[in-house]
Every structure is written in C-alpha cells, then in structure tokens.
Amino acid sequence: KRKSSIFNAPSRMILEEKDYSEANKLSKQFGLGLSKQSWNLIPKIRELDLILRSKRKTKIYESHPELSFQEMKGAFLEFKKKDKEGVKERSNILIHNNFKASFIDEFVNKNIKEYKPDDFIDACALFWSAKRTINGLELNIPDQPSFDSEGIIMQMKI
C-alpha cells in the first residue's frame, strides 16, 4: 500500500539543531516529531531559508511534484514513485499532459548511477506547475496564503 508522499516540514527553530535526536525532541515539544526524511533535508532547507529571507521581493514559489501529478491526473496516484509501476504511471501522466513521449522515455531509461528517473519525472511535474503559475492557471494551496514569523508566504502553487 502506498504511503503519504508529503511530510511535515520542520519549523525554523529546528534548522539550527546539529543532532537528529535533539531536533526530534524539540519538534515534538511543538507538535509532531521530525522524520528522518525531513532531517536529511535540513541542509537544503537551511540554504533555501537564507535565500528566502535575503530576497524578499523576489517571487519564489513553492510546489510539490506529487500534488502536481495528482492535479494532472485528477485523482490520487496508485504507485510509489520509485517503483517501476510508479515511474510508468507518472510518465504516462506527463505524456497525457503534453510532454513528448520520446523526451520522457529518453531520460527515464537512462542507466546512469548518479541519475534517478523519479527525480527527472518530479522535475517535469514541477515544470508543469511553474508553467501553470506563469499563465495564471495555478491551484493555490491553501487558497488564501498565510505567512510565517519572518513574513515569508506559506502557500504552494500547483
């Protein structure tokens, strides 16, 4: 059975923690614990947080590939993105949303150690959402944005 593809992002105070167990303990004090998956993303989240705080007037939007695929399909996805069936399911969704089959197949079937087909497919889904946003066709989640303690918008564009 497929699990949720979306996990809670850590709060800003967690970004300064150097140890997973301490970060998890702190996170639990303010709600949910911190998953290992979230913890492994901390360096990139920290880097992005610095960019967002330093470039407040720049339009930087958040999105999520699994929500993009769900919106393209009009339904929940059936398979995990890293499974063969999941790659095929997502490839077909992209093809049905105006991506060329030859383009998708070329990159999905590459056999390169450092290259993961699901990362390429996710990038295509994010491109789809970015194009919708540029054209004013995006789905906003939530409809009305909220802002964090630094005044940074908390809303995804799908």
Language-model features, listed with the residues they occupy:
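Phosphate- and other anionic-substrate recognition elements at nucleic-acid/protein interfaces
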Residues: 1-124, 129-158
